[in-house]
UniProtKB/Swiss-Prot annotation:
GO terms for molecular function: ATP binding; glutaminase activity; phosphoribosylformylglycinamidine synthase activity. It is found in: Cytoplasm. The keyword DNA-binding does not apply. It comes from Thermosynechococcus vestitus (strain NIES-2133 / IAM M-273 / BP-1). Residues 6-241 form the Glutamine amidotransferase type-1 domain. GO terms for biological process: 'de novo' IMP biosynthetic process. The gene is purQ. The lineage of its organism: Bacteria, Bacillati, Cyanobacteriota, Cyanophyceae, Acaryochloridales. Its main location: cytoplasm. The active site is at C90 (nucleophile), H207, E209. This is Phosphoribosylformylglycinamidine synthase subunit PurQ. It comes from the Bacteria. One of its GO terms (cellular component) is cytoplasm. Coiled coil: none annotated.
Amino acid sequence: MSEGLNVGIVVFPGSNCDRDVAYVTREILQWPTQLLWHEETDLGDYDLIVLPGGFSFGDYLRCGAIARFSPIMAAVKDHAAAGKWVLGICNGFQILTEAKLLPGALVRNRDLHFICDRVHLRLEAKERPWLRAYGDKTVIRLPIAHGEGCYYADATTLAELEANRQVLFRYADAQGNVTPESNPNGSLNNIAGICNAAGNVLGMMPHPERAADPALSHSPSEHTLDGLQLFQSLLLASAFA
């Protein structure tokens, strides 16, 4: 387990970030990685299943609303129930909420525009395994690209998420201050990413796979590899499980 995780990346019709994630896990981290067509029904012995970004089924009806009925999703639910890792990025986060693997919903951005930018995120609940590799770091910077990334949940669900420390990423400024101005899409409580109560399923709107290689950074800085550390966190968590 300490040599790497066995990764499966689900490909839905309309996915467009699957190969970006595969580049990180297969080429940079040297982890065994397979692309899995959405009609698969057996996830075998994968440690990590990733639902990548994109526009699954053209975002018809609602983002992720059709993808949740794909045959592979029953296996993803079983994988999660077994305590194994599941990561949903952007459209993958939307699919996880539609499939009820995570609470709440992702709705239209506050200004109704598609947003493509880099944002600062304050790390919350650092005891969670997904954040183990970040050490003393409290603020990271990741790209976002979405039109329906506004996180919404009812008051009771929000209170439970906060009380259970299921919020892992919160939109903030460069100093880690959570403000209305640092919220790009109107998400309640500035929420950018949450996990399930057990902690093995994570959904996030920012794209960690786009901040994992110095060669792809337009301005190398302390935040260049902020996304890579998310994946490295799982290896650390698995090695010491």
